[in-house]
Amino acid sequence: MTLSFVTRWRDELPETYTALSPTPLNNARLIWHNIELANTLSIPSSLFKNGAGVWGGEALLPGMSPLAQVYSGHQFGVWAGQLGDGRGILLGEQLLADGTTMDWHLKGAGLTPYSRMGDGRAVLRSTIRESLASEAMHYLGIPTTRALSIVTSDSPVYRETAEPGAMLMRVAPSHLRFGHFEHFYYRRESEKVRQLADFAIRHYWSHLEDDEDKYRLWFSDVVARTASLIAQWQTVGFAHGVMNTDNMSLLGLTLDYGPFGFLDDYEPGFICNHSDHQGRYSFDNQPAVALWNLQRLAQTLSPFVAVDALNEALDSYQQVLLTHYGQRMRQKLGFMTEQKEDNALLNELFSLMARERSDYTRTFRMLSLTEQHSAASPLRDEFIDRAAFDDWFARYRGRLQQDEVSDSERQQLIQSVNPALVLRNWLAQRAIEAAEKGDMMELHRLHEALRNPFSDRDDDYVSRPPDWGKRLEVSCSS
């Protein structure tokens, strides 16, 4: 089957990119590819059998027209000016059978006009982390970019030490970022901001294109998508680590996996990025930061959208987030209905977990073992303060009995929303260290395991982290 590519970005937004081709690595070789995703995108298996090829920037497929995008943004709350694709190149937009498109974005593809002081490269460590994280999030049901392939090489890339240069093929319906809009707003080119909005509406919100109120309705949906995404992050214990405006997806996708981390111990103020000295992007601050970023996006639209309309959309953020979050957290607790005491029970559990540094994922997963008419619970052994747990658990069982459903029904609900497996940093690190020694088996094993996060397992993928794997330091270095 021949793949078809279109050039919408190149044709319709001529001042938002620089056309250029990837710079190949030395002795590039394909070490992993996403068979399931490739099948979904109707990519012939033969493309993965002819060396690095397009996956390593050594060839282009017919119809591809590579370019690097320019955008700007606020980083750690401070205006950073022009940024852009410093090491990534959009190879093309694949046209799918249903008329939608999928960006093919090659990360680590070499120098671009937007590399600033960088070298345009990515290292094997960061490409493995992003591939694992994006696929883990996908199978958790959270909107995200996807990973299609990883190429390693003999080209050294210098970070803290010399590391193998690598490339990641990332795919997504769009790489539109808040930062695209900021770029032209701060250059006082509001008409180009409008062109970006029209482009987004035309291709991703086409049902609004002929509506006279399209900009307000569109921005309201961007707010809702963002609120929903953040609610989902919070419920699975995911910390992004670098929520700069240039890393915010207009479509509400999880974008740009860098120093991310999933909670091990329940620590509301968890900071996964060791460069985040002030804790701006801590786990519990993510909802507020996302709203702040939406406010920056709203500012760029103010020359052609009524400020009252923008503020009305922004005002809806909190309620949308709380609605999604509350619904999912009730499911995580096994509640089939909504009752007035639900929030208090959840907050009391969180307080107990925070005091005892309980494992976030294991605690919620073990709730499925609760029998509503039994005072015994395997979860009790997870807590030191048994009296405090017993007090909470008695009220929790009483709440379960209000729903009048069987233990098996409730267990099925809890296990469908509380994963047994999340991508803990130590699991990723183990796969990385093996891969850097030339052993790709753990990378493939872990990818396969992450496809079934809600299935029970009896291996160390679902255990607490070993001592060496606790609080691994992760930075923006990639």
Swiss-Prot record:
In the UniProt record, does the keyword rRNA-binding occur? Answer: no
Gene Ontology molecular functions = AMPylase activity; ATP binding; magnesium ion binding
Is the Transmembrane keyword given for this protein?
A: no
Active site, per annotation: D246 (proton acceptor)
Q: Which InterPro entries match?
A: adnlytase_SelO, SelO
Q: Which reaction does it catalyse?
A: L-seryl-[protein] + ATP = 3-O-(5'-adenylyl)-L-seryl-[protein] + diphosphate; L-threonyl-[protein] + ATP = 3-O-(5'-adenylyl)-L-threonyl-[protein] + diphosphate; L-tyrosyl-[protein] + ATP = O-(5'-adenylyl)-L-tyrosyl-[protein] + diphosphate; L-histidyl-[protein] + UTP = N(tele)-(5'-uridylyl)-L-histidyl-[protein] + diphosphate
**Residue numbers binding ATP:** G84, G86, R87, K107, D119, G120, R170, R177, D256
Q: What is the uppermost EC class here?
A: transferase
The catalytic activity of this protein is classed by the Enzyme Commission as: 2.7.7.-, 2.7.7.108
Cystine connections: none
Which cofactors does the annotated protein need, by name? Mg(2+); Mn(2+)
- State the family it belongs to: Belongs to the SELO family.
Cite the HAMAP family for this sequence. YdiU_SelO (MF_00692)
Q: Which NCBIfam families match?
A: adnlytase_SelO (NF040880), PRK00029.1 (NF000658)
Q: What does this protein do?
A: Nucleotidyltransferase involved in the post-translational modification of proteins. It can catalyze the addition of adenosine monophosphate (AMP) or uridine monophosphate (UMP) to a protein, resulting in modifications known as AMPylation and UMPylation.
Give the protein name, as stated in the record: Protein nucleotidyltransferase YdiU
Gene source species:
Shigella boydii serotype 4 (strain Sb227)
